A protein has these predicted regions:
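Extracytoplasmic/lumenal acceptor-recognition loop(s) of multi-pass membrane glycoenzymes
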Residues: 2-7, 23-94, 139, 301-304, ...
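Beta-sheet entry/capping signal
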Residues: 32-35, 97-98, 129-132, 227, ...
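A cross-kingdom signal targeting lumenal/periplasmic-facing segments of multi-pass membrane
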Residues: 51, 58-208, 215-217, 233
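Active-site-proximal, structured, solvent-exposed surfaces of multi-pass membrane proteins
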Residues: 185-354
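Short, flexible beta-strand-to-coil junctions
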Residues: 39-41, 101-105, 231-234, 276-278
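Membrane-proximal, lumen/periplasm-facing interface regions of secretory-pathway glyco-
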Residues: 2-21, 288, 297-306
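Active-site-proximal structural scaffolding
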Residues: 12-19, 28, 83-84, 92-93, ...
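Short conserved micro-motifs at the rims of enzyme active sites and ligand-binding pockets
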Residues: 47, 143-146, 334-335
Length: 354
């Protein structure tokens, strides 16, 4: 698979120009933040655009950040991570301040974002229109946090529990349930036989060649954002349908991620259909996880963590200098991944990271 240079050049030119316009609008005087997007030519686009993101591929295989992002519900592979699977919480913790969306310029419709309404700017060429949305809850690249965050262990199969655990212990030594689970009121298989396969639930078509799917019915407890995740050790491509409309593919191709279902009226009934594809002939998952985010509690946590940021006075690719004030015992938390070669100094004295 290859693309013409003209296509590459147009995409990169528009991307670089959009990032340039973001930086003209926001000088980031209050800190260092990340810029991401929900469309990808490659996972290394940010490097080509001159911005900072979480999408990245490297043959050096820094496994720790890949697994960290995977456990938060993002797209991942052996050597890469991709900005797909975001939530309000993960965007805040990772300091993702702006998110870019892409649409067709011929339609002349500004593309929307599932999470954010604050439109910073649009940019276009003859084929595409890009829209940039601002995340009002983005945290700085480093800030003071509770020491109990050092004891946080992220599990493999529930990114909502992981985000609850991480955000809770950034704020204090007490656990807070920001994401709350929604029970499935009905499970409706259509031409699908259920069986057990180790720790997994397995569905296969009863009659091959005919439509085979599993429908999950839930009710929205509040008008807050609702998310979904299906953990599995056996990734077989399926199609997802939200209220009968196509939502996305799932599992294969880096698609075992948190899916944003949206906001609904309180007590509104929501249908999610998982369609088994004819070539795979099965689907296996350990659990069906539906959660909503208590947005009021989440915003309170963000407000607390913003009280003691690292005030950066000098920043480059390999050097960061700043001051931070701690009004109690704690740790300075940063989402810059640790690599051999970094040196940390506190008040001029070398310190070991924890």
């Amino acid at each position: 698979v290859y693309s013409k240079y003209s296509s590459y050049n147009r995409y990169i030119t528009l991307g670089r120009d959009t990032v340039k316009k973001i930086l003209q609008k926001d000088s980031f005087d209050d800190g260092v933040y990340r810029i991401e997007k929900n469309h990808h030519r490659t996972v290394n686009d940010a490097m080509a655009f001159g911005s900072y993101g979480i999408s990245h591929s490297s043959s050096t295989l820094n496994a720790a950040p890949i697994q960290f992002l995977r456990k938060l519900g993002f797209s991942y592979g052996g050597h890469y991570t991709k900005y797909k699977g975001s939530t309000y919480v993960s965007d805040a913790i990772l300091g993702i301040k702006y998110v870019m969306e892409k649409g067709d310029a011929e339609d002349d419709i500004i593309p929307t974002n599932k999470h954010y309404d604050d439109l910073l700017l649009t940019n276009r060429d003859e084929k595409d229109i890009w829209a940039v949305y601002e995340n009002p809850n983005a945290l700085p690249i480093a800030f003071m946090a509770d020491s109990s965050v050092l004891d946080v262990v992220l599990e493999k199969d529930n990114p909502f529990a992981n985000q609850n655990n991480l955000l809770s212990h950034l704020v204090s030594d007490e656990y807070t349930e920001y994401f709350k689970q929604i029970s499935v009121s009905k499970t409706l298989p259509e031409n699908a036989k259920q069986s057990s396969y180790g720790a997994h639930i397995k569905y296969t078509p009863i009659v091959e060649g005919e439509n085979s799917h599993i429908e999950f019915i839930i009710k929205a407890p509040t008008e807050d954002m609702i998310y979904m995740y299906l953990p599995s050790n056996y990734e077989r491509k399926v199609n997802l349908w939200l209220n009968k409309d196509f939502l996305d593919y799932y599992f294969e191709g880096g698609n075992m991620v948190i899916q944003t279902l949206g906001k609904f009226e309180e007590n509104e009934e929501i249908s999610l259909i998982v369609t088994i594809t004819e070539d795979k002939k099965e689907v296996l998952f350990k659990d069906k996880l539906f959660y909503y985010l208590d947005e009021d509690k989440f915003k309170e946590a963000v407000s607390t963590l913003r009280e003691h940021p690292l005030n950066i006075s000098d920043f480059s690719e390999d050097h960061i200098k700043g001051t931070i004030t701690a009004d109690k015992d704690g740790v300075m938390f940063t989402t810059i991944s640790w690599e051999p070669g970094w040196t940390v100094k506190v008040d001029g004295q070398k310190a070991e990271p924890v």
